[in-house]
Amino acid sequence: MEYLEDNKTETFEEEDKEREEDQVLDSDEVLDSNELNDMQECLSQTDLSNIDNNRAIQQLSLGSMEFPSYTTNSEKEEMLLGLADNFWHQYTHLYPDRKPLFMCPRNECGVEKFVCTTLHPTLLPYSDLYDWDQSAKFVSEYLTMEPLNPPLELPRSLFSSTSVLQKQSGNCFDFSVLLCSLLLGAGYDAYCVSGYATREMCLMDEKRNICPLLNKVEESSWEIPQKPLKKYTVKPPRQLISKFAVQQEAKKQAKMEEALRNEQEEETRLKEDAEKPGPDNLHGLRVHCWVLVLSGKREVPENFFIDALTGKSYATISEPFLGVESVWNHEDYWVNMQDCRNGCKDMKFDLGDPVCWEYLLQGGSKPLLLIPDEEDEEELNGETIQENKTIFQMPPSWVLPIVIRPKEFETRCPQGRKILQYKKAKHEKWAPYLKRDGHVSRLTGYLDTECTQEVKIQDCFQNRKDKLDLREQNKIEQVTTEYFIPGRADSLKVHEYRSLAPETERSMMFYSEARLDGLQRRDEKPVEMTEIYQGRADFLYYRHIVFGKRPKKVAIAGGPTEANPRPILKITERFNRNKEKPANEDVAERTFLLTEDRIQLRCHRKDDHITTSYWEFLKPANLGEKDTPIVLTPETCISYQVEPSEKFSKQLYVYETLVTLQQAEQNSKDNVRKSETEVREILATRAQEEADPQLTISIYDTERNEKSKEKREAMERAIQEERQRRAVQELDYLAPFLAQLGDPEKLTLWQAQKVKEDCLSDMKQRLIEKANLIQARFEKETQELQKKQQWYHQNQMSMSKEDEEAYLDYCSEAMFRIHILETRLNRHKDLAPQKYLALEDRLNKDPRLREPFLTS
Amino acid sequence: MSSLYDTMEPNVIDDDMLRNAVEEQGPKEEAGRIAKLEGIDFKHVSSLRLDFKNILKIDNLWQFHSLTKLQLDNNIIEKISGLDTLVHLVWLDLSFNNIEVIEGLKALTKLEDLSLYNNRISVVENMDTLSNLQVLSLGNNNLTSLENLIYLRKFKQLRTLSLAGNPLSEDDQYKLFIAAHLPNLAYLDFRLLNENIREMATMKYQYSIDDITHNENQEKRKQEEEEQKQRELDLHKAAYVENLNGPFLFESMYADDADGTKLSGLPGVAELMDSYRSKCIEICQNIFEYGMKQHEKREAEAFEFNECMQEAIRENQEQGAKKIQELTEKNSEILNELSQSGNQDFLDLKISQYIDDINKLLDSLMTLELQLVDQTEEIIKEYERNVSDMVSAFLETVQGLMAQVRDLENHHHEKLLEISINLLEKVLKGEMDDEITDDIRMIFVDKDTVINAVSASHDIHLLKIDNREDELVTKMNTWANNLIQKVQKDEIQRNRNRILEITTYIDHLRDELDNLELHEQM
């Protein structure tokens, strides 16, 4: 008990007095029985966990363990261990109250290794890992965390990063060593830190943290730039308002706001209190290991911590870090001499300061504390250089280089999936291609801390053939939003909907530059549709359509919906200003009231006018019909013109405008119908894509691209076959004959003659044999046929019809066979001499049998 | 045509002919019926065809102001005239006529397509202003000289040219000559000039073309230089310090001064002149630089003023437009309601409400306008004050500098007088007999003559300086006055226009309502 008590209050005092004071203070605290129980439990676990650790070591029969550096210590390492031992003895002698240091844990082979040599600075060939944040993310994702057991003591062993990577799991020390190795390799001034942290930190419990992905970047407040006051800026008109009244109003407003704010603050405080974790009995005792990055290298502006378990960075004054025992990198080891009563808030990380940090080797490149006196500095430099020569250098790392294969790098999490729990949020990750629909991550937001009621789901996809990138589902409003990357045939960018049925509320955004009609956005409501365009040659940028109710119609059984389109009540189109036309003739808004046969036109405002011209046309009933005179009454066209002109008042103008407008109306109607069809088509495509999601595979992806894989394999196979074929071809036709002679290097004339003769006679023999064989078969067939015929002639009378047919079949078949054999025989007879001659020719030409090569 | 010419009386373009042509060629079918009923205004006709009419003289076309296409082919026109008012013409067809000289086309700067096929033209000329010409048809004419076609190099846009049927087109070199000399031409006699021909042509006429291009380039450069000079001078003139950045003033002093020039030949005067000259130039340069700076300042001031003015007007306009927009939206709602509702009381209520709205709109628009007038008045006054300050400061400084020039002149005069009198004594004593010319001897007769001559020169110089100063001061003051007047006038004009617009619009709204009421009652 005393020990625990001590530990609990333990801070790293150097003065006895101080410690005594603290003890006096702390002895006031009374531990209740509950806490006692907790601690006993913790202690009882200690033994068990030791066994666990040992077993783990035994189980790991890794290939790398056969490597000598893993199983033995080199001479230099032995010396280093001696030094460390010496240091440790002195340390415990000087500071008997401090906890043991983490210096020489055993590795996976049970060999003591100094911690600094466990760090192996490595730069992996992935550009992602060049920056600390991506490295930290990788480490936190790649490994599975095992909590320290017991949580209050340093682990007995520290495995090499290679075996940690192999089993894809480790404790905080393993995490930190791996991350530190990567960071050092990338050129950061990184250190492993052994110290104490809060329970949440040690257990990687992020249930109380807000998910980092949910923290949206706040939109930068868009300030309207203050217009510079120019010399001739007009004065604003005088406002006839009582200043006093304004003041009173402002005061009232301020009061109300303050009350509201107070209320809100109160609320949030209450909420926070409720969410606070219960008190931790072991606060300040939990051992943890993390990474420290010092400023200076790689443009790091100031020191910060990285928690390797979560991959998050913290300022060095962050609260969760409660104390530091020691830090190390691949070059040296430092012990903290500063007071950690206030956590790490007052810590200095100037490792060259011997008052704050006690070094082990002083072999590192860390400069000594900078002394402002310049003369001294020079001397000092000289000294250090001299000293450095004699100083013991840290032996190279015993760990094999860290290797991560591309596939492992891509798969990341063990088994390709990982689940992180945050406050009111859950984040699931999958490796690409793991899920059949290309799902790579899902972020679920919950309404309550217990995570029962879903509010929002964010699904990320990758490599989808339909270019789906992100799907957001708002469970409260039942709205789904899908985001697509460019490249779809319909150029869809965002699709927001409640249901996939047509003619319901939805909003679609498009990549307008990829579309011929420049459509940027289409919003739909049950009876309305709004389309927004961009960059069109006809300056159209807005179209609004109001639909009416479908007239009742006797439905054709199974007929398509197009058979009964919704009637269009009104089409409004707006246009951008066309600078080439005068404003009075450039239409800004065009409204077709289809049910009333009316068309309204409104022109753009001219630069120095405040009114706009407009026309209202009432379509005559027989417009567009040929050979019927049209009566243009004054009511046909009601207009207001900013600058009345004779041209516009002419009847001819009215008539011509009417005709073009009618054409335009028809076009607009067609376009609306097209839009409706398109929406229906997109919805159908989407439904199909969702039902059967397909993934694309890059042509450079040699692992997954089936086609290229097949092709490659086929190519390999072809090469193989080619090789075999060549081998067969090289089979020597003279080989058996030469073998008879005992494979002489060179043939004598006589031997050549013999070989030639043998070969030819063999050929002759074979040809004759073949001919005989065919002859024999032919004869056999003929005989059989004759027999059958005889039998037939004998029994012809008593035969049934079927037998007769069978006989006839047999006859025709036999005749066919005989005929074939006959042909073959003839052919053979024809070919045999040729073949014989060919062989003879070949033999004559064969270099081995020709004169110059023959030994006499 | 010539056979017809003998037998038929030439026709005159008169109103009936024009009307018939316009109606015949105007809108067709239903539109044509309406147009006929209504009558077509010659002003709005854009294309006219008057072929096979036996016209001798082009006349009476001044009404067709917006005409872009005119066909006068197959007539007996002998002289191109009466086309000066048709400045919008793009297409002109004068083929199959009896034209002998190209003329009267100066005003048709927009012309792109010109056909003079089958006429009696012998020289290509008088087309300098037709810089947009793209198609030119000169077939079946009397063109004889290939050299004359170099004239066509002027038309950078010319793509199609037809010359077949001319005496010159029988020349073997005809095609090559044209291909070489008109590099922008794409079609000759309706055939593509391909790369081959062009290459051959360039090889053949290498030297002459080089010569021509060289000359053209030189001319162009000269023209550019002149333009540059002119621009600079204009700028200086705008700053009212033209010809002050050099010895112009000094030289102009001696230009009309015979005695002075003579006197400057005296021994010892040369040095005096030199120092006087350099000092004078220095001061002039000062004036010039100061003037340019002031000019820039004035421009900046004007720019800033205009900008602020425009901004104020724009803001005001937008407010007004917004108000009108609001009313329009409301208006359409009310009209809808009116058309749907049958209740008389409700109608009356709505209508009175609408009338109120209109009145309110009128009020607010007028208030806005008044407010703007107040605001602009204020800044115009300020601008006026600033401009006059600037002008007076400028004039003061310039006058001070001019006074320096005058001092210099006085000083010079004294010195000259002294030297002259000294010299006179010597001359009278006969010491200088060999050194002086006869001209000077004429002056150095007696003291009075000498003094007269010197003072006369002095007077001339002073007069020149005074004149220059006066010119500058007057111009400057006129500018200031004009500027302010113009600004005020513009503002008044703007105000008038706006008020007119507002009243027209309000009247229109009221009319509309009246019509509606009338309609309802009926």
Curated annotation (Swiss-Prot), chain A:
Protein function: Component of the nexin-dynein regulatory complex (N-DRC) a key regulator of ciliary/flagellar motility which maintains the alignment and integrity of the distal axoneme and regulates microtubule sliding in motile axonemes. Involved in the regulation of flagellar motility. Essential for male fertility, sperm head morphogenesis and sperm flagellum formation.
Protein name: Dynein regulatory complex subunit 7
Species, as recorded: Xenopus tropicalis
Region (Disordered) residue spans: 1-30, 255-277
Keyword line: Cell projection, Cilium, Coiled coil, Cytoplasm, Cytoskeleton, Differentiation, Flagellum, Spermatogenesis
Primary location recorded for the protein, binned into one broad class: other
Disulfide cysteine pairs (residue numbers): none
Subunit and interaction comment: Component of the nexin-dynein regulatory complex (N-DRC).
PANTHER family tied to this protein: DYNEIN REGULATORY COMPLEX SUBUNIT 7
Keyword Cell cycle: no
Biological processes per GO annotation: flagellated sperm motility; sperm axoneme assembly; spermatogenesis
